[in-house]
Structure formats: structure tokens, C-alpha cells
Amino acid sequence: NDFIDRNIDSPLNLLTPNLARLIALGGFRKLQPKVNQFLKDPRLQKVYSFQAMYAGVSPQQALAIYAVIAYMDSVNGVFFPKGGMHAVPRALAAAAEKHGVKFVYNSSVTSLEKNGSRVTAAITDKGERYECDAIVMNPDLPVVWKELLGKEPLSIKRLKYSPSCVTLLVGSSKHYDHVAHHNIHFGDSWDGVFDELIKKKTLMSDPSVLVTIPSHDDKSLAPAGKESYYVLFPTPNLDADIDWKKEAPRYRNEMIRVLESRGYEGFGDAIETESMTTPLDWQARGMERGAPFASAHTFFQTGPFRPRNIAAGFDNVVFAGSGTQPGVGVPMVLISGRLAAERIVGPVK
């Protein structure tokens, strides 16, 4: 609760007994050495440290505090919503509508009306005007500033971004008995591929990949006798010198080759429908540098040093999403929504 579940306005807010305990446990040391201190099997070392990649840093550079992600996975398990991940926002919307919230879909905010330090109305691409007492904004922060609020603050311009990824969503006729719902397939290389991804900003020569099979536990997510696959390969973000318009077809074939070499025999031939998302697609969806994991969780972009959820220079503009506090990931983003609401109506009792 001290570090994630509340609004933090200053590093001084963290000066609690829990901070002292965290320091004593080595939470501000590096993740990989800390994991290696307790786990000696190289396979387990990977399992309990790879999550740093999604925070935008290598396990060798990430803070040991991020071991909490693997801890939660191990102790609490990994949950899957019936109906797929989209069931979560559908349920949230239904609960909000029950309490009088009105949603306007397929409509984009293109400009804001301002009066001094307050935003007074949002204007959509359809010419609709919505007056507001306060406004919560959840696009990536650089996009919000450049396209809606005005001059981008220097603190936002200086942000360093996480790697990106390519995803392949597949409808397939192929079933594999040896796989689970969530599968992580590590390459033989470890430190080297993180250097490729983060420092050299090149494609990983021996990638570690995620394969999720939603239909493994929810048969409604694929036709009878079929399977649905979500495949994720980490890649550099758009700071890299990669022309994804040209690279995408070749990389799609490389992804299939890697999958087939990792035990998914005949994967390519069994594809019946597919959708590929590259860093260019993430950028088109409003994600700075084509980075779906937002700004990296380096030390000075974590906790109180991460961009606050209050817009500087405005009295009634609040942020939510992975680019602000507390950070990246579905649980964090859900918490960010509540923290944004608390900025407007006060702390939830």
C-alpha cells in the first residue's frame, strides 16, 4: 500500500517503516544478482527475473523490487477472466453504466477548450462538445501533451521508453498436448539478447517468447476443434533502425520458424486466420515510440519519480494509464484509474 496503492506527490511520502524493511531486504539492489542469491538452477533464475523486460530494463539492471511480480505469480497464481481479457473492460463498463455513466464509443477527442488553468470542454471528431468539471486522460502522456494540452514538458520529452513487441494472434486447426495456457519459451542466450534488445536496439537473435492459448481453458474463444493463440516476441521500440513496413513479412516467418523449433510443429501450416501487430501499429494506436509498455521502469522513472497523474499547469486535468503512477501492467493500470478518481473526489474509504 505504501508504494503502489496510493497517490505519491513526493519521495518523502515513501519515508515509512516499510521503506526501511524494503531496503534491508535488498529491494533496491539489482534483480538478477538477488534472484541468483537464492536460486541456483539457471532455468529458475530466468523464470524469476524475465519479468523485468516488461518494465523496460534487463534483469541485470532492474531493481530487485520487481521480484514481487514473480512472487505474486507463484503464490497467488495467474488468473484468466472467462471470456478473455476483453471481458474485464466489458465488466467495468457494465458496472459503471449501472451507476449512470454514459459511454460514447467510436468517437475521438480532437481538441480541448481551456479557460486559464482549467479545461472546460472536450471536442470530438464528430463535432460533439462535452463540458467538464474535470477530465481524466489515458492516452500515452507525450501524445496527450502534443495533441491536446499544448507544449510538452521537458520532463516528458526526457522519458526513456521500454522495448516494444510484435504480437501474432492466430486462429489455428492445430492442438498441442504438451502446452499450458501460458507458456514462456526461453532461448539459450540470456544476457546477450537483452543487450541486443535494449542497448544495441536490434532484434533478439535467440528470443525468449510468450505463447498464450486462451482456448486452452475457455473453449468459447475458438470454434469447436480449433485453438486461439497469442504469440509475443519482444523487439526494440521505434528508436531502432528497423523499417517495419519491409521487415514485418520476414519477421512473421521468423516467428513461425522459432515457434516450430520450440515444439510447435506444423504451426505455420495450421494457421487459418491471423493478425500481426508491430511497433508501427502500436505507435498508430497512440503509444509513444511504438512501446506498449510505456516509459521504462528505471530508478528515476519509478514510484515518486514516475510522471505524476496531475497535469502541470492545469487545475482539473488528471492522468491514468501505464505512463503515469503506479506503472505498467493490467493491475497497475486498473489502480491508476482509482488513483485518478481520488484526485477528483478524494481518497476512497
Segments and roles (model prediction):
Residues 322-345:
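A conserved FAD-binding loop/helix module that cradles the flavin
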Residues 1-61:
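Rossmann-like flavin
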Residues 110-223:
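Mid-domain catalytic core of redox enzymes
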Residues 46-79, 311-315:
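Active-site-adjacent "gating/activation" loops or surface patches in catalytic cores
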